[in-house]
Regions:
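Register position in tetratricopeptide repeats
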Residues: 1, 8, 42-43, 77, ...
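Residue-level recognition of tetratricopeptide repeat
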Residues: 4, 29, 38-39, 64, 73, 97-98, 106, 131, ...
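Structural marker of alpha-solenoid helical repeat scaffolds
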Residues: 25-26, 60, 93-95, 127
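TPR alpha-solenoid repeat register
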Residues: 32, 67, 100-101, 134
Length: 147
């Protein structure tokens, strides 16, 4: 879709507009609500708006691991670390993905749980050793791409 192409090009305004157009036509499209909410949480400081979109997606599909990850990430951005950890653990349990593991590890790290964060990252790196997301998170937080 155009929204995905806009994301690949780094066109945040285009991505946002395309997702808003989808939501306008399909107000209960949980995937579009979550995609827009996550994008805002990850790439802007519009956290309240992001959280409202993600929470609507969650109400529509509370079992979706991508939405659980987004809820965790937006709560992290808002400083709600315990809440962020809870959602990210649920997401990782349902979908053991390298990006979710990077997010959970970062939240654990921010809470001073470095040993636990490293354990989460190690498990994810074992499954996906070429993950640039995990390596980038490690480098940013620990100063090294290696555990």
């Amino acid at each position: 879709t155009r929204a995905m192409l806009a994301e690949k090009r780094g066109d945040l305004p285009g991505l946002e507009q395309d997702l808003r157009n989808i939501i306008e036509r399909e107000p209960d499209n949980a995937a579009a609500l979550n995609a827009l909410g996550y994008t805002l949480a990850d790439r802007t400081t519009r956290y309240a708006e992001a959280k409202a979109l993600i929470e609507k997606a969650y109400q529509l599909d509370p079992e979706d691991p991508a939405t659980l990850d987004s809820l965790g990430w937006v709560n992290y951005r808002l400083g709600n670390l315990a809440e962020a950890e809870r959602y990210l653990r649920q997401a990782l349990e349902k979908y053991p993905d390298h990006e979710v593991a990077a997010h959970l590890g970062e939240v654990l790290w921010a809470q001073g749980k470095q040993r636990e964060a490293r354990k989460v990252w190690a498990g994810a790196l074992e499954a996906q050793p070429d993950s640039t997301i995990l390596r980038g998170t490690l480098l940013r937080l620990t100063g090294s791409e290696k555990l």
